[in-house]
């Protein structure tokens, strides 16, 4: 089952219920559009306002930027080897730990969508689409090869609204 887009209030609820470390991981993912695995592989030497990341999934390089408040939080959190150290400081925090915490937080608030860390990447894409209205800019920001894949992300809010309208229509309630 694919992960789904979250409304801003749902993002805020999920973030509020995460552990401090996982909240910082997800704030970073939300601001940069990076996949959680790439966020977890950040090393302290990379923490600058703009830096390059090689994406684990694709092997492609991309530049990301961080605003000062987030950059400061990341620097304060960073260990010697990793920005997000694991129990063994020579290894980074795990994707599985973040995934479980995001799932737990979403369930605690009874959020009906299939929420996972990747949902935050869709939120990032939708926000970029709203800001720029340019699918090519969103495609480049996500480092996608295909515009059609980017459209799935960038229009995820509209897909969610349509899903709710269909659900309301089938239950006999008036769609708004």
Regions found by a protein language model. Give the residues of each.
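Active-site/catalytic core of tyrosine-dependent DNA strand-transfer enzymes
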Residues: 67-112
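Short, polar N-cap/turn motifs at the start of nucleic acid-interacting alpha helices
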Residues: 45-49, 134-154
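Conserved tyrosine-mediated DNA breakage-rejoining catalytic core shared by Y-recombinases
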Residues: 8, 20, 32, 41-72, ...
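DNA/chromatin major-groove-contacting recognition/catalytic segments
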Residues: 1, 5, 9, 65-69, ...
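Basic, Lys/Arg- and aromatic-enriched nucleic-acid-binding interface segment
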Residues: 4-32, 36
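Active-site His/Glu-centered metal-binding helix of metallohydrolases
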Residues: 120, 124
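Active-site-proximal segment of tyrosine recombinases
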Residues: 38-39, 114-115, 125, 132-144
């Amino acid at each position: 089952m694919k992960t789904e887009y979250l409304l801003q209030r749902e993002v805020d609820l999920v973030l509020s219920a995460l552990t401090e470390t996982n909240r910082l991981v997800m704030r970073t993912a939300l601001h940069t559009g990076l996949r959680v695995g790439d966020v977890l592989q950040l090393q302290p030497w990379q923490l600058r306002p703009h830096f390059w990341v090689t994406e684990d999934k694709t092997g492609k390089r991309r530049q990301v930027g961080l605003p000062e408040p987030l950059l400061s939080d990341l620097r304060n959190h960073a260990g010697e080897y990793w920005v997000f150290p694991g129990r063994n400081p020579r290894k980074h925090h795990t994707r599985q730990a973040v995934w479980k915490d995001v799932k737990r937080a979403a369930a605690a608030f009874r959020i009906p969508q299939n929420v996972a860390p990747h949902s935050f990447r869709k939120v990032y894409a939708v926000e970029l689409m709203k800001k720029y209205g340019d699918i090519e800019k969103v495609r480049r920001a996500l480092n996608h090869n295909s515009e059609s894949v980017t459209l799935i992300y960038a229009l995820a809010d509209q897909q969610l609204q349509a899903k709710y309208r269909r659900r309301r229509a089938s239950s006999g309630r008036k769609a708004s």
